[in-house]
């Protein structure tokens, strides 16, 4: 789908690379048709996860090595994607060439969040808006919390799921806990270039952000910032941290939704009822 292949997508939070040199980005393969991995060497890069020799996958899950070696014929690559060596090819002429290196994909990092794509465009305006609104959050210090991960498959077109996310009229009837935690009458929606922001104002007694004076939301009892970035990325910020929701089309009437949790170290003890799950 062109609308997905030509846009930026969430790859990972840098905390997912803690202690690892490479992690497989399996969720992006279903979106983009390209096996990718995120590597941490002298810098964080998104590179192809396919060996340039015979197409074998290089990393299954994650690894912690200074080089990447193909498990099929032993071709070895650096963490910058460059081919380093291959058994029995020491005397080969004009080898290796640039064609033997792994493809490097565009990537952008913002406050610990890494985004990538095939030939993406248009994320800068979204990040500029988010920086102005929530740049005060220590998102780069959030820690990956595997226990908050979820995965659902639904019988619906991906756009129908996005439509459901973007309208709040169903909240009093479907999300009882969320409706109790938020002041429904003060629910706010703002549109910006490439996305939508919904702001949940807390009911009395609910956990809220400590918002600094320089923020446009100073003085508000904000319980959640819900960002949708076109076409299928949701970044839901709560006082406890961040829930990333990925919308992954499987067919015209099947969609997989993946949730990934990243927790602020000062709120690891909290579980709030403001999650927006299916």
How would you label these PLM feature ranges?
Residues 1-7, 11-12:
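Signature of the catalytic double-stranded beta-helix
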Residues 268-274:
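Conserved small/polar residues in nucleotide/adenosyl-binding loops
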């Amino acid at each position: 789908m062109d609308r997905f292949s030509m846009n930026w997508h969430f790859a990972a939070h840098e905390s997912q690379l803690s202690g690892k040199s490479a992690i497989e980005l399996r969720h992006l393969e279903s979106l983009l048709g390209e096996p990718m991995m995120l590597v941490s060497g002298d810098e964080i890069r998104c590179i192809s996860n396919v060996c340039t020799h015979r197409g074998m996958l290089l990393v299954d899950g994650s690894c912690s090595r200074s080089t990447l070696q193909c498990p099929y014929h032993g071709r070895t690559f650096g963490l910058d994607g460059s081919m380093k060596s291959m058994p029995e090819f020491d005397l080969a002429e004009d080898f290796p060439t640039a064609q033997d290196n792994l493809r490097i994909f565009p990537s952008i990092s913002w406050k610990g969040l890494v985004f990538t794509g095939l030939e993406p465009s248009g994320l800068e305006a979204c990040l500029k808006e988010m920086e102005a609104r929530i740049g005060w959050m220590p998102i780069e210090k959030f820690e990956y919390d595997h226990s908050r991960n979820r995965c659902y498959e639904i019988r619906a077109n991906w756009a129908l799921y996005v439509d459901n996310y973007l309208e709040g009229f169903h909240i009093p009837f479907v999300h009882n806990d969320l409706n109790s935690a938020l002041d429904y009458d003060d629910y706010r929606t703002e549109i910006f270039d490439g996305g939508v922001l919904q702001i949940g104002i807390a009911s009395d007694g609910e956990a809220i952000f400590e918002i600094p004076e320089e923020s446009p939301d100073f003085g508000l009892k904000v319980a959640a910032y819900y960002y949708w970035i076109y076409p299928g990325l949701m970044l839901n910020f709560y006082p406890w941290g961040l829930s990333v929701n990925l919308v992954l089309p499987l067919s015209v009437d099947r969609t997989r939704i993946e949730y990934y949790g990243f927790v602020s170290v000062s709120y690891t003890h909290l579980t709030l009822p403001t999650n927006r799950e299916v």
